[in-house]
């Protein structure tokens, strides 16, 4: 008989780059999870915007099992039917002409930045290597992407960092304009800064970036790792803004919980990447591709995308009512089912404590820095699950407020 597993085993065996919750989930269905002791949680964290169709969705299980019974992996010396079908679905649904598959958002962003540098080098010369990104951004944990992310706490211990990356203020087109010039090869931006506090870009800001990139022959990269695949109520957030990037990165919800990432590119951009210029062992493997193909099939429908907008209203209405009672938040913001509740000055820096109280009450939420409680639930979360989960969240807020005033 195998040894029982406990949360303490994490502290014994794992490299301590995470600080997981004190409970261990063991089973999920829809927007509900159960831990080792059988306690139920409503899941509004969604694996950090990954579980777009909830846990153990029957059609995703079927797609995975069907492919698993055929073959799992061949490597990039061969292609496969599921990955080609998935590529065609993404191309048909977006601006893209070409796709590169990988395993995560960080890998997709790494590929995008490498492509941008090579595109500029091949077309304009080695002087055009500058990358403009934004303060409080998050683009992944590779050395290149953590340098592009404008959060020194994630990068300062790993110097020397890749050179020629500068950071402007987000949503400030004048700040960006001061940095973007003819030496810039690319601008990388999140349409909504997720880890940076659930901060949506303004239309004028993204349109201004498009114009600056056009003027200076720089590529515009949209990091849609968190906002993509229906999260905002459109298949990709760029569709809200009417601003089309040259490159787009996607991951998280694309696999519905199965690891997969992708870089979407125009034909003009893609042609600079030739055999051997980039690659990955597992990217585009048939298991991930089969699942992701089913995810796109289920999410890219008017019913599902309109349902996300309806669910946004459910959340915001109930969160506003809750906030009227407890006075925790100065602002509730976001698009679709990526929602951030900004703590007011009286509770600044205590988002983690609220998330811990929420877990005790049986609801899982995220944070985005010390001042924002973040919600990224399944796109098909039911109204009953929203009501039950927010009732539990209200109980957690009541306990948090009463504890602070006692």
Curated annotation (Swiss-Prot):
One of its GO terms (molecular function) is pyridoxal phosphate binding. GO terms for biological process: alpha-amino acid biosynthetic process; arginine catabolic process to glutamate; arginine catabolic process to succinate; ornithine catabolic process. The keyword Transferase applies. It comes from the Bacteria. SUPFAM superfamilies: PLP-dependent transferases (SSF53383). Keywords: Aminotransferase, Arginine metabolism, Pyridoxal phosphate, Transferase. Its EC number is 2.6.1.81. It catalyses: N(2)-succinyl-L-ornithine + 2-oxoglutarate = N-succinyl-L-glutamate 5-semialdehyde + L-glutamate. Gene3D superfamilies: Aspartate Aminotransferase, domain 1, Type I PLP-dependent aspartate aminotransferase-like (Major domain). Pathway: Amino-acid degradation; L-arginine degradation via AST pathway; L-glutamate and succinate from L-arginine: step 3/5. Its cofactor is pyridoxal 5'-phosphate. The modification N6-(pyridoxal phosphate)lysine is found at residue 252. InterPro entries: Ac/SucOrn_transaminase_bac (IPR017652), AcOrn/SuccOrn_fam (IPR004636), Aminotrans_3 (IPR005814), Aminotrans_3_PPA_site (IPR049704), Class-III_PLP-dep_AT (IPR050103), PyrdxlP-dep_Trfase (IPR015424), PyrdxlP-dep_Trfase_major (IPR015421), PyrdxlP-dep_Trfase_small (IPR015422). Pfam families: Aminotran_3. The keyword Transferase applies. Belongs to the class-III pyridoxal-phosphate-dependent aminotransferase family. AstC subfamily. Catalyzes the transamination of N(2)-succinylornithine and alpha-ketoglutarate into N(2)-succinylglutamate semialdehyde and glutamate. Can also act as an acetylornithine aminotransferase. This is Succinylornithine transaminase. It comes from Escherichia coli O9:H4 (strain HS). The lineage of its organism: Bacteria, Pseudomonadati, Pseudomonadota, Gammaproteobacteria, Enterobacterales.
């Amino acid at each position: 008989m195998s040894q029982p597993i406990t949360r303490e085993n994490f502290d014994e065996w794992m490299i301590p780059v995470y600080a997981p919750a004190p409970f261990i989930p063991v089973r999920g269905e829809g927007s509900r999870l159960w831990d080792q002791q059988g306690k139920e949680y409503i899941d509004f964290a969604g694996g950090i915007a990954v579980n777009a169709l909830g846990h153990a969705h029957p059609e995703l299980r079927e797609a995975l099992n069907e492919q698993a019974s055929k073959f799992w992996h061949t490597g990039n010396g061969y292609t496969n039917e599921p990955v080609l079908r998935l590529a065609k679905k993404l191309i048909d649904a977006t601006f893209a002409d070409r796709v590169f598959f990988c395993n995560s958002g960080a890998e997709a962003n790494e590929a995008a930045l490498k492509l941008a540098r090579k595109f500029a080098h091949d077309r304009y010369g080695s002087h055009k290597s500058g990358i403009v990104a934004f303060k409080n951004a998050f683009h992944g944990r590779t050395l290149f992407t953590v340098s592009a992310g404008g959060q020194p706490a994630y990068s300062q211990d790993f110097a020397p960092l890749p050179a020629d990356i500068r950071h402007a203020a987000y949503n400030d087109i004048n700040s960006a304009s001061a940095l973007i010039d003819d030496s810039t090869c690319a601008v990388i931006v999140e349409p909504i800064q997720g880890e940076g506090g659930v901060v949506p870009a303004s239309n004028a800001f993204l349109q201004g970036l498009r114009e600056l990139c056009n003027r200076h022959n720089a590529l515009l990269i949209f990091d849609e790792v968190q906002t993509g695949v229906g999260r905002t109520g459109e298949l990709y957030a760029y569709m809200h803004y009417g601003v089309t990037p040259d490159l787009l990165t996607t991951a998280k919800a694309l696999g519905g919980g199965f690891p997969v990432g992708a870089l979407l590119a125009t034909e003009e951009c893609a042609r600079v990447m030739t055999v051997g210029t980039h690659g990955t062992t597992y990217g585009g493997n048939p298991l991930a591709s089969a699942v992701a193909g089913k995810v796109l099939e289920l999410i890219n429908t008017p019913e599902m995308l309109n349902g996300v907008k309806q669910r946004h209203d459910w959340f915001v209405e109930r969160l506003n009512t809750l906030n009227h009672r407890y006075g925790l938040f100065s602002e509730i913001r976001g698009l679709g089912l990526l929602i951030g509740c900004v703590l007011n000055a009286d509770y600044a820096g205590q988002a983690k404590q609220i998330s811990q109280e929420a877990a005790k009450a049986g609801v899982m939420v995220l944070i985005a820095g010390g001042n924002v409680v973040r919600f990224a639930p399944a796109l098909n979360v039911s109204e009953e699950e929203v009501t039950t989960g927010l009732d539990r969240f209200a109980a957690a807020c009541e306990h948090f407020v009463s504890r602070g005033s006692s």
